[in-house]
Amino acid sequence: MSPDQTAVEYTAKDIEVLDDLEAVRKRPGMYIGGVGVRGLHHLLWEVVDNAVDEALAGYCDTIKVSLHKDGSASVEDNGRGIPTEMHELGKSALEIVMTKLHAGGKFSKKVYRVSGGLHGVGVSVVNALSEWLEVWVKRNGKIYYQKYQRGSRSPEAGHRTEVLGETKEHGTTVRFKPDREIFETTEFKYEIVAQRLKELAYLNRGLKIILFDEREGKEETFHFEDGIIGLVRSLNRNRKPLHEPIYIETTKDGVSVEVAIQFTDSDVENIQAFANNINTSEGGSHVVGFRAGLTRAVNEYGKKHLKKFEPVTGVDIREGLTAVISVKVPEPQFEGQTKTKLTNSDVKTVVESAVYSGVLRWLEENPAQAETLLNKFILNKKAREAAKRAKELVKRKNELITTLPGKLADCSSKNPEERELFIVEGESAGGSAKQARDRRFQAILPIKGKIINVEKAGMARVLKNDEIKAIISAIGAGIGKDFDITKARYRRIIIMTDADVDGAHIRTLLLTFFYRYMRPLIESGYLYIAQPPLYQIKKGKKSYYAYSDEELKRTLEQVGGGEVQRYKGLGEMNPQQLWETTMNPENRILIQVTLEDAKRADELFSILMGEDVESRRNFIMAHSKEVKNLDI
């Protein structure tokens, strides 16, 4: 990443301004998607994306992200440094970038051919939504400095840029503290930051990203010379791969394509697709092109090398497939519920062509492994056709597979938009929930202690499990590739388990099941987790509830002590308490499950419940010190 520094000029005249910075503090959600945990971390991503863009342009190979004790975060890169010369608007280019919305060198594609970031609103929005922000630029042999408060320069600073000294280094450092007046929380989560930085390091081969948590004295370095090949290996670390990863790389018509493919003995399809470093969880043209190219290559090879070969479908081929698709597009277009579906039609053609020729070449060069894979695909086809015949036979015999489970206490409303289903752990708690609920719109489905471990069970075994069958028929929208979100009988599916280790285990099992077999529920925002209280505080005739240790401490201080009861199970609450604390829409706390939450649960479960004993041991050793409460 060290091209001739004079190859592309990056100066004040390259800074374009498309819009003024207005109303960001009044409507932050329009710019960063919300003021919760996701919006908070989006501030950090905006600054990180700028540094990664320097890496994509070839001028930066190291980025350091620090989470500081005072609640601020900083991002340091060794790129060219933001220009500091005077701009035609009468201010320094650095101040323009920091105070004007959509100002920067990314819009003409002259300075940056490709840039990342979903919203791409720029560091000015970070500035506007921070209590304070500092920026240091090492450029032209000098160190430049500016400081802002809630997006504005202090009156004494005017429009001046301070020069702190001389240097032979180059790059930009931005440090900011999110504004408590704007955000619901201002605490950066190490796990969220680490996951995103690790992902970026995989997607940008050779880029070194250092994460330092000053609060805990913890540091990690993410640096992967094998790029997305390493990501595929990591995704398959708890599964049995059938061959070494297939790697395809090409650039055509300005679109760069990288694909890594590896088949495993699992029956789960896992395709992760990215466009300009954005995780396109809703898929798009690059995924469509990938699937088409893969299917075409396999069928062409099979027709050429096997007698009496009958074409297999994409569904037959992709069972057990792990793939990472990464495209870099000059003008990406996104749509979909979360704006994470790529729609550029030209990308489909480029990806399909690259995957078709790359996979076909690999099959020709590896005949033994090709035969193993083809036999797997043919077996998958036979199993699919047999399952289809069995399904039709069941229908003909008029055995209604859509019959609602006997233990479901359904609600009276016929409108799916207002109906909600509580999946409750245990018959006892299920009984309390049935008494507590509002029968008009709340349905209760009690499930036994442990549902099946979907990590070790294939689709056939999953469908034989009574608890899973009850969940599938209650929701009424099918499963796997036949899942149809429009047929879901409820707008909210709420997981309600005990606040102990067993409850967490069952919750993780359910999240993994929904992620693997009913993912559209999560993508559409239908899945929630109930938050029952951990404590009841009795003071005289009054009862108070606390949902965390911090809230318990705060409540005890406010009411002046009291009798504390810790709830280990939902069954310890009577129906009235359960309604007041956990089920009443007026009072309850629900956590909406995101795709990232479910993905983390799935990865955690692969480690803890998979076949790889070594990974499980390493995970337990690494996290044993974090255990605070054990219900023994």
UniProtKB/Swiss-Prot annotation:
Subcellular location: Cytoplasm
Main location (coarse class): cytoplasm
Note on cofactor: Binds two Mg(2+) per subunit. The magnesium ions form salt bridges with both the protein and the DNA. Can also accept other divalent metal cations, such as Mn(2+) or Ca(2+).
Cofactor requirement: Mg(2+); Mn(2+); Ca(2+)
SUPFAM superfamilies: ATPase domain of HSP90 chaperone/DNA topoisomerase II/histidine kinase (SSF55874), Ribosomal protein S5 domain 2-like (SSF54211), Type II DNA topoisomerase (SSF56719)
Enzyme Commission designation: 5.6.2.2
Gene Ontology cellular-component terms listed: chromosome; cytoplasm
Recorded superkingdom: Archaea
One Pfam family it belongs to: DNA_gyraseB_C
Keywords from the named record: ATP-binding, Cytoplasm, DNA-binding, Isomerase, Magnesium, Metal-binding, Nucleotide-binding, Topoisomerase
Top EC category: isomerase
One biological process term in Gene Ontology: DNA topological change
Binding site for Mg(2+) 2: 498, 500
Residues given in the record as Mg(2+) 1 binding sites: 425, 498
Reactions mediated catalytically: ATP-dependent breakage, passage and rejoining of double-stranded DNA
Domain annotation Toprim: ranges: 419-533
PANTHER family: DNA GYRASE SUBUNIT B, MITOCHONDRIAL, DNA GYRASE/TOPOISOMERASE SUBUNIT B
Other comment: Few gyrases are as efficient as E.coli at forming negative supercoils. Not all organisms have 2 type II topoisomerases; in organisms with a single type II topoisomerase this enzyme also has to decatenate newly replicated chromosomes.
Family: Belongs to the type II topoisomerase GyrB family.
Quaternary structure (record): Heterotetramer, composed of two GyrA and two GyrB chains. In the heterotetramer, GyrA contains the active site tyrosine that forms a transient covalent intermediate with DNA, while GyrB binds cofactors and catalyzes ATP hydrolysis.
Role: A type II topoisomerase that negatively supercoils closed circular double-stranded (ds) DNA in an ATP-dependent manner to modulate DNA topology and maintain chromosomes in an underwound state. Negative supercoiling favors strand separation, and DNA replication, transcription, recombination and repair, all of which involve strand separation. Also able to catalyze the interconversion of other topological isomers of dsDNA rings, including catenanes and knotted rings. Type II topoisomerases break and join 2 DNA strands simultaneously in an ATP-dependent manner.
Protein name: DNA gyrase subunit B
Species whose genome carries this gene: Archaeoglobus fulgidus (strain ATCC 49558 / DSM 4304 / JCM 9628 / NBRC 100126 / VC-16)
